[in-house]
Amino acid sequence: MSNDDNVELTDGFHVLIDALKMNDIDTMYGVVGIPITNLARMWQDDGQRFYSFRHEQHAGYAASIAGYIEGKPGVCLTVSAPGFLNGVTSLAHATTNCFPMILLSGSSEREIVDLQQGDYEEMDQMNVARPHCKASFRINSIKDIPIGIARAVRTAVSGRPGGVYVDLPAKLFGQTISVEEANKLLFKPIDPAPAQIPAEDAIARAADLIKNAKRPVIMLGKGAAYAQCDDEIRALVEETGIPFLPMGMAKGLLPDNHPQSAAATRAFALAQCDVCVLIGARLNWLMQHGKGKTWGDELKKYVQIDIQANEMDSNQPIAAPVVGDIKSAVSLLRKALKGAPKADAEWTGALKAKVDGNKAKLAGKMTAETPSGMMNYSNSLGVVRDFMLANPDISLVNEGANALDNTRMIVDMLKPRKRLDSGTWGVMGIGMGYCVAAAAVTGKPVIAVEGDSAFGFSGMELETICRYNLPVTVIIMNNGGIYKGNEADPQPGVISCTRLTRGRYDMMMEAFGGKGYVANTPAELKAALEEAVASGKPCLINAMIDPDAGVESGRIKSLNVVSKVGKK
């Protein structure tokens, strides 16, 4: 476009697209509508990828996990007000889990919104977003688009990663500027996530504590997986001989079948250890805040490696805090521990005996006949376990209560950043969004193991998966209920609040053009899984399991408050 003086012009749409591209963003996930529909169209016209979802929350979850896998911000695009609010849930999820993400939302006109005159989808979105992310920006001028996007990228990935909100008022897109000036304004931040080198005395203190430990363990969190310094972490573990425990999304950072893995005896390892080395893991509710019977009677000493200084001492005193990026910290710690004796053989031997015993028990459960003759979690997930061991490049998405807990315990992972689950909040609804992003980012097949209740939060995105013909196989653990499917009704004519229809989810997939299967036995599940993944097409396996399978609230039943007085 040119003006009367023959100066070539560009507009807000094009400058925003150019700014995103300059910052290596080539994919967006979102839901189109006023005022951003044409932005999505023009993004596609420019040759970039746009995955159009049925609900903004799931588009946001896709962006969040894309950020985790790739180590750069995943980008979600939404409409204003209600659509923006749907996206904020996933923005908060990204921030809580330390995933780099940028939420871009169109918004109504500032001069009307600020006077609360009732504009279309009126909302002060920038300030609504602020408590739920690392930073919240609004771009009012076309000239500020390049610096606004660059700041969002740097903020999302620097230090502890997280979500960033960028507000895009509708009038911004129609503003114009000369192409020459726009090109001068475009830039990419230099070294947006610089190494943060830990202090020498912090490394020395941590090394001394580890050298003097009698029963050390290493706890690997998803922060360690995000750091993508897999070889350094593996070398630290193997050079020290210290047993390790992976949190859910750290499974596969070292293979779950590694001889130093103590995952099969986690409770014993935590209760008996005297020093715990936390690498990219937080002492939050997932680790019982470092206290209680989980951690035994003996006072523990902690080494904690984290890029955020105020994470230290958040629940327990940290004897050796190491503030810095994980790659730098682990590298320096290896040097400080060079030549030190390996972990005590009596301690590692005791753990190995426990691991071997527990693995034998689990193997028996995976092959045992059930009293009802129906599948349960053990024998059905045993099929998934064997398949994943033979196909370690597949991404495994997992959510639910019992479906989450049992899959994490039973299905071994051999490669990093392949297990994608509910994360720090234990949130339901991440499933189908994660599937879309994992397939888009890796270009490889994805398997999702879903509780039937959890699947309900994002099930309509089956249409999205089919529309883009993604190689996703969804397995629904169908016991017909939240937790269980056989809770008695409280009274005649009143359906239990935990009951679900034991439905034909396979037919949902077929309604959108995918392939559906019903599996009633492990053999049927195995055959369906092999055929589905080999097809490279969208597939869903309706795995019918015993309604009595499962326990209320999975392994966190203690968090479910019960009445002290009972029924009146």
Swiss-Prot record:
Protein residues bound to Mg(2+): 452, 479, 481
Result when mutating residue 120 to F: 2 and 12-fold reduction in the affinity binding and in the catalytic efficiency for oxalyl-CoA, respectively
Cofactor note: Binds 1 metal ion per subunit. Binds 1 thiamine pyrophosphate per subunit.
Keywords, comma-separated and alphabetical: Decarboxylase, Lyase, Magnesium, Metal-binding, Nucleotide-binding, Thiamine pyrophosphate
Residues that, per the record, bind thiamine diphosphate: 377, 401-403, 426-428, 453-454, 483
Record note on modification: The N-terminus is blocked.
Keyword Signal: no
Gene Ontology molecular function: any one: thiamine pyrophosphate binding
A Pfam match: TPP_enzyme_M
EC number of this enzyme: 4.1.1.8
Chain positions recorded as ADP binding sites: 160, 222, 282, 306, 326
UniProt superkingdom: Bacteria
Membrane-traversing stretches: none
Family: Belongs to the TPP enzyme family.
Oligomer status and interactors: Homotetramer; dimer of dimers.
Record-given protein name: Oxalyl-CoA decarboxylase
Natural source organism: Oxalobacter formigenes
Taxonomic lineage from the root: Bacteria, Pseudomonadati, Pseudomonadota, Betaproteobacteria, Burkholderiales
